[in-house]
């Protein structure tokens, strides 16, 4: 493999530190960064704005045809647009968070976004692609496949702390219930259920700080691809 090209597939459930770690890893590798979860959140926001019934997969599929969106791949910051509007903050809100599993489970939505993800990854040269089915479905031939995991309690604590920092209140029990709900939906959906690829490296971040995680991932990338730090 040419060291000028590198695709790192980064999978795992929400709350594992996946986004922060993926951005930092991309910067350390001199790579681009693609948050595929943000793509599903953009689609979900679009569906919500259209007032589509989330129980109607055909209506969801119809609403996302010609989705007017764009997403950047600069690891320095998020660039997500819907209808030309910066929606980086809105796609992280509670309404989108509660609806995204339903929208992402629609096969037509996944087909649309997976095609875009593959195109962006192939055009990037070096890239860290973050998601939930990157190593298994989107980029099964990725040079390096990593699966981040952590206990539901650890992930809920992190998200609750983030909510507090952003002024959204303290409700650990509700956050934990939502984490468990999303885990169940993501792991049991008929299309692209959340699971590690057979050849992925599992890294449990429950008790690790971000610097420790990055150190481990750089070692994995070096061992699997020959790309140094």
UniProtKB/Swiss-Prot annotation:
Reactions catalysed, as given in the entry: CMP + ATP = CDP + ADP; dCMP + ATP = dCDP + ADP
Broad class of enzyme this protein falls into: transferase
Entry keyword set: ATP-binding, Cytoplasm, Kinase, Nucleotide-binding, Transferase
GO annotation, cellular component aspect: cytosol
InterPro entries assigned: Cytidylate_kin, Cytidylate_kinase_dom, P-loop_NTPase
Keyword Transcription: no
GO molecular function, one term: ATP binding
Predominant location category: cytoplasm
Record-listed E.C. numbers: 2.7.4.25
Key word Secreted present: no
Compartment(s) where it occurs, according to its Swiss-Prot or TrEMBL record: Cytoplasm
Domain of life (superkingdom): Bacteria
Chain sites annotated for binding ATP: 12-20
NCBIfam families xrefs: cmk (TIGR00017)
Family: Belongs to the cytidylate kinase family. Type 1 subfamily.
Protein name (record): Cytidylate kinase
Organism: Rhodococcus opacus (strain B4)
Biological classification of the source: Bacteria, Bacillati, Actinomycetota, Actinomycetes, Mycobacteriales
């Amino acid at each position: 493999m040419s060291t000028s090209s590198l695709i790192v597939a980064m999978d795992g459930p929400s709350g594992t530190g996946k986004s922060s770690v993926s951005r930092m890893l991309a910067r350390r590798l001199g790579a681009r960064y693609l948050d595929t979860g943000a793509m599903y959140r953009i689609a979900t926001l679009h569906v919500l704005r259209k007032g589509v019934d989330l129980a109607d997969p055909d209506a969801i599929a119809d609403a996302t045809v010609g989705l007017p969106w764009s997403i950047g791949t600069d690891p320095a910051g998020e660039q997500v647009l819907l209808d030309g509007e910066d929606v980086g903050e809105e796609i992280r809100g509670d309404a989108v968070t509660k609806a995204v599993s339903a929208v992402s489970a629609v096969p037509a939505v996944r087909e649309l976004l997976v095609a875009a993800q593959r195109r962006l990854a192939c055009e990037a040269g070096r890239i860290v692609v973050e998601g939930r089915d990157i190593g298994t479905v989107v980029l099964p031939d990725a040079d390096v496949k990593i699966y981040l995991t952590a206990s539901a309690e650890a992930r809920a604590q992190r998200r609750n702390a983030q909510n507090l920092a952003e002024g959204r209140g303290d409700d650990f029990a509700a956050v934990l219930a939502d984490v468990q709900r999303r885990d169940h939906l993501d792991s049991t959906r008929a299309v692209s259920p959340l699971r590690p690829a057979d050849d992925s490296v599992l890294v449990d971040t429950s008790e690790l700080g971000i610097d420790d995680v990055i150190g481990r991932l750089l070692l994995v990338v070096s061992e699997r691809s020959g790309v140094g730090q």
